[in-house]
Amino acid sequence: MNKWTTQEMAQRLARDIEPGWYVNIGIGMPEMVCENLREDDDIILQSENGILGMGPLARGDDIDTDLVNAGKKPVTARLGASYFEHTTSFAMMRGGHLDLCILGAFQVSGSGDLANWSLGRPGIPPAVGLSLIHI
C-alpha cells in the first residue's frame, strides 16, 4: 500500500478546492491545507471556533494572541472577516452554508471508517453529522 504523508494529503486536498468556495478548516491536518491554497483563488476560510474570513497563520509582529484558529494557533483575518460563537459556526456547517468541511481524523480504518473525536467518556462529539459524504 502506498502511504501518503500528511503534507502530501494536505497538498492534494488543497488542489481539489474550487475557487470562491467557503471552506471550514478543522484541527490537525486540515490546518496544513491552508498553507497550500492558492491566494488568487479567493477561498473563504471558516474556523469552527467562530471566524469567517480566516487568513494565514500569523508570524512575528502579526501575532495577536486573541486571534487563533480552532487548533489554538495564531492566525490573521482577511478584510471583512466576521466573528461569532462556535454554535453559529456549527450551524453554518450543518445547515449547508459552506461548500466544504475539512475535518481532522482521529483514526481512519483500512476500509475508510472514521473516528474524528474522543471525549474520553461516553457522549456525542460536537462534529457528529459533519462527516457525512455527499457525492
Describe the function of each predicted region:
Residues A81-T87, L119-L130:
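Active-site glycine-rich loop that binds ribose-phosphate moieties when present
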Residues M9-R12, E31-M32, T87-S89, P125-V128:
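A generic local structural motif
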Residues S111-R121:
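Glycine/threonine-rich flexible loop motifs
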Residues R59-S109:
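Ligand-binding beta-strand-loop-alpha-helix segment within the catalytic cores
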